[in-house]
Amino acid sequence: MSLSIGIVGLPNVGKSTLFNALTNNDILAANYPFATIEPNTGIVPVPDDRLQILADLYHAQKIIPATVTFVDIAGLVAGASKGEGLGNKFLHNIRECDAIVHVVRAFENSKILRHDEAPIDPKKDIDIINTELILADLQTLEKRLPQLQKEAKANPKARQKVEYLQSLIDNLQKGVPISALSDVDFEAISDLHLLTAKPVIYAFNVDEEGLNNSDLQSQLTELVSPAKTVFVCAKLEEELKGLSENDAKELLESYGVKETGLAKLIHAAYDTLGLQSYLTAGEKEVRAWTIHKGWTAPQAAGIIHSDFERGFIAAQIVDFNDLVAAGSEVKARENGKIRTEGKTYVMQPNDVVEFRFNV
């Protein structure tokens, strides 16, 4: 399964700079509003150190990591849902994304213009974007409702949906995003691609000092709790882009940082969406596959090919750490570390798998 993340934020918060760094891209990231006109898309590999280890173990010809697609749209402004600025035009480009990353400026720099030339105010900025997403969803629902009301005259199920959509409208009008509701019927609204129904990860763009400022991070985390937060320095991420792996690691360590912004964002997205990965390995290739936590072995097999799920017989599974400790698949089997699991087996994050199937 592929994972896609839409990046939103006000103009000049470092959104496009961060996107460039995450995707190793070189799109325009200018110091003025609406540097991003057309939506930009970048597909990036999910960092996973296990893949190279397995590739060395199996002498694999190639490595295929799991991937994430990032979509960067024009900066939103107050009134975007009514056509102000350029952002509203491109909101549809993130409607089918699995999650939203909201980039929030949390650094001072007089050389970089703020969208309204006011002092830095993360809470105000967050409220502006959230309001625009709510208003965009209201427009979607209010456009859909009249059509559904006509259907409801002859269809009892449609009447239930009318009542449900009206309840969503009532909550949105109170400023409550759909994701904050406890009893969301995602199946009923799946065709609407509502923005506030998507999980949101807040990426606070801080300066280098902010990466280790626990007081600042606590204050910012409290603003958006219980949503996931990550703290990135877009400027630093841009510097990392052209460095070798070792040089990048040294630069990160010099700032007391262990992970790149990309790794932080992807880990937060996996956690927020309840995702994990399993591995397949052989001489031809080593590969990571993204699945939902709690999926059974047949469901996981279906990600490779629908025939694998339909004709599932069993899964040969070894824990990654046990495999590495053994030094080879043959040794792992001799040590009794490779086991056979059936249709009810729930996949675990460190599983290295070979599926057996028959169609």
Regions found by a protein language model. Give the residues of each.
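C-terminal-of-GTPase-core extension/linker across diverse P-loop GTPases
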Residues: 2-8, 13, 19, 147-346, ...
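Conserved G1/Walker A P-loop phosphate-binding module
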Residues: 1-84, 88-114, 123
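Conserved Switch II/interswitch segment of TRAFAC-class P-loop GTPases
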Residues: 42-47, 74-84, 95-157, 171-184, ...
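Generic signal for short, ordered secondary-structure residues
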Residues: 16, 33, 69, 120, ...
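Glycine-rich, flexible loop/turn motifs
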Residues: 25-33, 40-42, 50-53, 82, ...
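Helix N-terminus capping/helix-initiation residues
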Residues: 47-48, 121, 244, 319
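Amphipathic alpha-helical transducer elements in NTP-driven molecular machines
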Residues: 34, 48-51, 64-70, 84-98, ...
